[in-house]
Regions:
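Bacterial N-terminal signal peptides that target proteins for export
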Residues: 13-25
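Short, surface-exposed beta-strand/strand-loop-strand elements in extracellular ectodomains
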Residues: 69-85
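Noncatalytic modules at the cell exterior or secretory-pathway interfaces
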Residues: 98-114
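Asparagine-centered strand-capping/turn motif at beta-strand->loop junctions
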Residues: 64-68, 108-112, 120
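Tight coil/turn sites that cap or link beta-strands
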Residues: 41-49, 53-55, 91-93, 103
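Intrinsically disordered, low-complexity Pro/Gly/Ser/Thr-rich segments with frequent PxxP/GP/PP motifs
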Residues: 82-103
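C-terminal partner/receptor-binding element of secreted or periplasmic proteins
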Residues: 112-134
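Sec-dependent N-terminal signal peptides
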Residues: 24-33
Length: 134
């Protein structure tokens, strides 16, 4: 009888240990997903502008890589006044880290006669994106 009690306690311990490991793996997966950055490849057609963040309400950071062979102009502007807050000309194959305030939109201006491809990685989901003709 004494030996059967020990073996049943052993199995209960093993089951609890497995549940603890599953909980740990689940928590690590949630942590990884919550820290995951939003990344996408975007093509901006010739002589068009991509406006990003018109409906956004929080600050964010953007990692931008120009994967094309032509430059692109990136401008930050205040939503309310249209006043430019920052302007960068990103050369072909260039990289940029951009900090964007909640009251700003970013314009990716393609004034070339060819499409521009960029890789864009954001620290959060950003609402409000559209294209306009230059």
């Amino acid at each position: 009888m004494f030996s059967s009690l020990n073996s049943s306690n052993f199995f209960i311990y093993k089951i609890k240990k497995q549940k603890s490991i599953k909980k740990l793996i689940s928590l690590l997966a949630i942590l990884f997903i919550s820290c995951y950055a939003f990344k996408s490849g975007i093509t901006i057609p010739a002589n068009e502008t991509l406006i990003l963040g018109e409906s956004n309400t929080k600050n964010y950071r953007a990692e931008i890589k120009n994967t094309s062979n032509v430059k692109i102009v990136i401008k930050g502007e205040k939503k309310q006044t249209g006043e430019y807050t920052q302007r960068i000309e990103l050369p072909p194959k260039g990289n940029l880290r951009l900090y964007v305030a909640s009251d700003e939109v970013i314009r990716f201006i393609n004034d070339n006669n060819a499409s521009v491809k960029i890789s864009l990685q954001l620290t959060r989901g950003i609402e409000g994106m559209r294209y306009i003709k230059n």
